[in-house]
Amino acid sequence: LAAIRDIWGGGGEFSYGRVVLTAYAAARLPVDDALADDADGLVAAMLAAGLDRDAMRWAGVVDDGSVGWAMLALADPDGSAMVSDGELDGFVDDDDSPRQHKSRMLLAGLAGLGRVADAEIAEYGERLGIDLAAQTRWTRMIERAAEVDNPALVTMLAGLGMQGSGWDRMTARHLFHIVSALRRVGLEAEARMIAAEAVARA
């Protein structure tokens, strides 16, 4: 763990590549409540490499309402349970990211994966100042590609929708449509990982 921390906190500007670099080392660590302070980072590292099953082992260690909890709520490959109003409320209340961007990404990801009720989408969309239903030419194109079950076109349009100088430029609306479309064409694993990464990097 000390070596992992050294990589995360190395000199120079922080790079998400450092998180990716530690993915397999993080996956080899035993699940331990004593590592709770590092659990969010360890979960982010594992999910950066798509190691969702390894990351899910830490579900009992991450704090409720933490970033680690949010990433696992999105990444869970067996996720059939809906995220409740209370769980969302706790996360939003504690979110100190700029413009509550992590909360926006969480809501968009959960909505795209069908893991939050319509009532919560409406309530928290208003609370966070986002409208996932608003349409643009791009949203109509990716929705249509999903309707006709064209995973190649959905993937291409998802890539276009993710263009930008950083994850701070990713909008909740774009993430929602990307995740939803990927899930609808059978690329749910990719949808889950993108949603989790969006929260990690927001």
Where do the model's predicted regions map?
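Alpha-helical solenoid repeat scaffolds
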Residues: 1-202
